[in-house]
C-alpha cells in the first residue's frame, strides 16, 4: 500500500515495520482461524445448493431478476476481480515456481501444476465463497426480512434496530473496506505506472502515481454517480468484453496446444491437492511463505467482503438461493481458472523455453 505513495522506493520504515509486525502476529497466532473460516465459508456455500431452502427466491416467490444472466455475471466479475488479476495472472505462477517451499528440484511438471494450483487457490473458490455466503445473508436480510441494506443487518433485527450498535458495526465495516480498497488501489497504481514506464517511457515518479490514483478515482466516481444501470453495468460490460478479447488473443496467438494440455493437467492437479493446499498452515516449516501469500489473500478477501457482498446482494434480487450460490461461487471461479490457466501457462511456457 505504502509503495504507491512514495517516490523512488523511499518508504516510511515506521509504517512498513508496523504493518509487517501486524501481519506476522496475525499469521502466527490467528492464521489457523483465518484458514478455517475461509474453508468454512466454502463448505457452507456448497451446502446451501443442496438444502431444502435452495429454491427460496431473494425477494419472495414473485420476485423477478432485474438483470439478465450476462449482465449479472459481468457485474459479478467486475466487482470481485480487478486490476490485480491482470498482473498476477502472469506473475503469480512464476513467483510460486521460485518461492514456494514445497517445489521439487528438477520436476517442472509437478512444480508448474502446483504453481497454477496455488494461484487458483488464492483467486478462486475460497474467496468467492466468502462473497457468496455474506452476499446471500445480506440479500436475504434485506429482500426477505425487510432489514436495512447495511452490514449490521447481518446480526438480526435487534442489532439493526439498535442505532448506536448498528452504526458502530457499520463504521467498522467501512474501515475494513477502506483497507481492502487501498490495497487494490496501491497495487493497481504500481502496475499501471510500471506498464506506462515500460511502454511509453513515462517515469515512475510520485506525481505520476498520484495522477494515476486521481484518474482511477474519477472513473470510479463517475461510474457510481451515473447509477447502477447507466454507470456500473455499462462499465462492467466493457470490462468483461475487453477481458474476453485479451484472453482470446493470448490463447489464440500464444502456445495454444501447450495451454490446452496444461489446462487439463492443471484441473487434475488442483482437484487432487485442493484440500491439502487449503488447510496448510506451514506449522512444520520455518519459511514465511504462507504469511506472505495465502493468509494475505484470505485477509484481503475478508477485507473486501462487506463492500463487495453488499454490491452482489444489490444486483441479485429475484435469484434463488441455489442460483445465487452457483452464479457467485462457481462462475467467477471458472473464469479465474481459465485466466490463470491461459496467462499463467503462457508465462510458464516462456520460462521453460528460455
PLM feature spans:
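Helix-loop-helix module between adjacent transmembrane segments
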Residues: 1-2, 8, 42-47, 82-85, ...
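Hydrophobic alpha-helical transmembrane segments
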Residues: 31-39, 112-135, 209-215, 281-305
Amino acid at each position: 500500500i505504502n509503495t504507491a505513495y512514495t517516490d523512488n522506493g523511499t518508504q516510511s520504515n515506521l509504517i512498513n515495520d508496523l504493518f509487517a509486525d501486524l501481519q506476522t502476529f496475525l499469521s502466527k497466532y490467528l492464521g489457523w482461524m483465518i484458514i478455517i473460516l475461509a474453508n468454512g465459508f466454502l463448505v457452507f456455500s456448497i451446502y446451501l445448493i443442496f438444502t431444502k431452502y435452495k429454491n427460496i427466491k431473494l425477494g419472495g416467490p414473485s420476485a423477478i431478476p432485474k438483470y439478465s444472466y450476462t449482465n449479472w455475471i459481468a457485474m459479478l466479475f467486475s466487482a470481485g476481480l480487478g486490476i490485480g488479476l491482470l498482473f498476477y495472472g502472469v506473475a503469480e505462477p512464476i513467483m510460486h515456481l521460485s518461492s514456494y517451499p514445497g517445489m521439487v528440484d528438477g520436476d517442472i511438471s509437478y512444480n508448474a501444476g502446483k504453481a497454477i494450483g496455488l494461484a487458483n487457490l488464492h483467486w478462486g473458490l475460497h474467496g468467492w465463497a466468502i462473497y457468496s455466503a455474506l452476499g446471500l445473508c445480506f440479500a436475504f436480510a434485506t429482500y426477505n426480512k425487510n432489514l436495512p441494506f447495511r452490514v449490521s443487518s447481518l446480526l438480526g433485527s435487534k442489532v439493526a434496530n439498535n442505532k448506536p450498535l448498528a452504526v458502530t458495526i457499520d463504521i467498522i465495516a467501512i474501515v475494513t473496506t477502506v483497507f481492502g480498497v487501498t490495497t487494490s488501489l496501491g497495487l493497481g497504481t504500481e502496475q499501471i505506472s510500471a506498464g506506462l514506464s515500460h511502454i511509453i517511457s513515462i517515469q515512475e515518479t510520485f506525481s505520476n502515481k498520484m495522477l494515476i490514483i486521481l484518474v482511477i478515482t474519477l472513473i470510479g466516481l463517475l461510474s457510481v454517480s451515473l447509477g447502477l444501470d447507466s454507470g456500473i453495468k455499462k462499465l462492467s460490460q466493457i470490462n468483461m468484453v475487453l477481458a474476453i478479447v485479451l484472453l482470446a488473443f493470448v490463447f489464440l496467438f500464444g502456445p495454444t496446444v501447450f495451454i490446452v494440455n496444461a489446462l487439463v493437467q492443471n484441473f487434475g492437479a488442483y482437484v487432487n491437492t485442493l484440500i491439502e493446499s487449503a488447510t496448510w498452515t506451514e506449522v512444520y516449516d520455518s519459511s514465511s511463505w504462507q504469511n506472505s501469500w495465502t493468509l494475505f489473500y484470505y485477509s484481503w478477501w475478508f477485507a473486501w467482503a462487506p463492500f463487495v457482498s453488499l454490491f452482489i446482494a444489490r444486483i441479485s434480487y429475484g435469484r434463488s438461493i441455489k442460483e445465487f450460490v452457483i452464479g457467485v461461487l462457481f462462475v467467477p471461479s471458472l473464469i479465474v481458472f481459465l485466466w490463470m490457466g491461459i496467462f499463467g501457462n503462457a508465462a510458464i511456457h516462456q520460462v521453460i523455453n528460455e
